[in-house]
Amino acid sequence: MNRKAFIFILVIGIFGLGSCLSNKGAVDSHNSRNSLDWAGVYTGITPAASASGINVRLQLNKDNTYELTYDYIDRPGNSFTNTGSFKWNDTGDIINLGIADTPSYYKLAENKLIQLDMSGKEITGNLADYYVLKKN
C-alpha cells in the first residue's frame, strides 16, 4: 500500500512541477493598444517654422481610422485635414498614420499622444513638451 501512495504522490508532483515550468515562457501581452482607452480626440498646439504654432486635432477611432487636422495659427484659412487608416507597431504602443512628408508616428500614453519624429523616435530638446497631444 505504501508503494501505491508513493507512486501517486510522485505522479502528482511531476504534473504539478510541469505546469509551473510551462508558464515560464509566457510573454506579458499588456500594451497601450489593449490596456488603454485610446480611441477619442486628442488636441494640442505644436511648434511651426512659419507661424505662431499649429492647432492639431487628431481623432482616433476603434476601427483604426483617423482624422487629422492642422490649423496654422495666425494664418486664417490655412487648414489641412487628412483621413485614413493607421497601423500599430509590433509592440502595440506606437501608431503610424502613413502620411508622406509629415510626422505621422505617435506614441500612446495614458490620456495623451506623443508625436514622434519622421523616423519614429521621440523628439528631445527644449520643445519636446510641445509635441504632446492631450485627450479631450
Where are these regions (language model features)?
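N-terminal glycine/threonine-rich, aromatic-flanked beta-hairpin/loop signature
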Residues: S52-D90
